[in-house]
Regions:
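Juxtamembrane transmembrane-helix termini
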Residues: 102, 147, 225-228
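Residues in flexible loops and secondary-structure boundaries
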Residues: 55, 118-124, 130, 195, ...
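Residue-level signature of transmembrane alpha-helical entry/exit and packing/kink sites
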Residues: 39-46, 77-85, 89, 120-125, ...
Length: 276
């Protein structure tokens, strides 16, 4: 009886498809700065523009309410922030789409790979949430002491907290607002602005400071209530958590874990501010 040889197929190196290039990585961004497709205008407009768009969305809401009641009230629009915030998201996505197109990339390239095998990004996001969320709580407590001189946080019932919305507004706030808001916010500051300022400034510390400032300031404007103490309180309350949450971007460039960390924060925010 002749012997039979068992042949094991060997994968050719040529058959293994290489990983797609990271078009949002520092080397790729540096090259686009060199050839002139990336400059200061895009990152600057997007970084500042999100706050401007949030204020504009509140102004539009105030205008709609004025048409309904014939009584102008900026603060009356404030309680709708988990509804009109999506208008700012749409504007922000449009801005980023325009500027990324000039760079020759897509919006999707800002997100990077999403690793869901064995729930990798989900669990990493949960870990980040548990690590960072206490800094927002400590920030709020410290800001209350600094601004108001007591342990009692400010109350703007019906505006920033204890908000009363119709049923459809409540459903939208709990179902769609946070699903859109969190990834758009992450794309704006972490996916688009931060790596570009890191390259343009040639200084990580400066890039962190610049993006952290505007990312924190965004929370002052959602909603924007004309009270200087509240403005200062909200800025100081969010600053520590924003800085801590931005630092992992020095190592982790993918947005997946951060979106999974951000979603529960925004859901908690809806629960804490809506009167059910």
């Amino acid at each position: 009886m002749g012997t039979q040889t068992l042949e094991v197929p060997v994968r050719s190196e040529a058959s293994v498809s290489p990983a797609p290039p990271d078009l949002n990585a520092i080397p790729a961004l540096t090259e686009r700065v060199r050839i002139g497709t990336l400059g200061w205008i895009g990152p600057g407009f997007v970084l500042v523009g999100r706050s401007v768009l949030i204020i504009a969305a509140q102004a539009i809401t105030a205008g709609v309410l004025w048409l309904q009641s014939h009584s102008w009230s900026w603060n009356a629009a404030a309680k709708w922030w988990t509804v009109y915030g999506t208008l700012a998201d749409v504007g922000c996505l449009a801005l980023m789409a325009g500027y990324t197109r000039k760079e020759g990339i897509r919006l999707r390239d800002l997100i990077g790979r999403v690793r869901l095998h064995w729930g990798r990004d989900v669990f990493l996001g949960i870990g980040m949430f548990l690590l960072v969320f206490p800094f927002f709580i400590l920030g709020a407590a410290s800001a209350t002491r600094i601004v108001y001189g007591s342990g009692q946080p400010p109350s703007f019932a019906g505006l920033a907290d204890a908000r009363v919305l119709p049923l459809w507004g409540i459903i939208y706030s709990f179902s769609l607002w946070w699903l859109i808001w969190s990834p758009t916010e992450e794309m704006t500051y972490r996916g688009y602005a931060f790596p570009r300022f890191e390259v343009l400034c040639r200084n990580r510390g400066l890039a962190i400071g610049l993006v952290s400032f505007w990312w924190t300031l965004q929370h002052v404007f959602l909603p924007f209530i004309l009270d200087w103490k509240l403005v200062l309180w909200r800025f100081l309350a969010f600053l520590p958590g924003v800085v801590i949450l931005l630092l992992p971007s020095l190592k982790i460039r993918r947005l997946g874990p951060f979106v999974f960390a951000h979603w529960p924060m925004d859901v908690v925010g809806v629960f804490m501010t809506l009167k059910l």
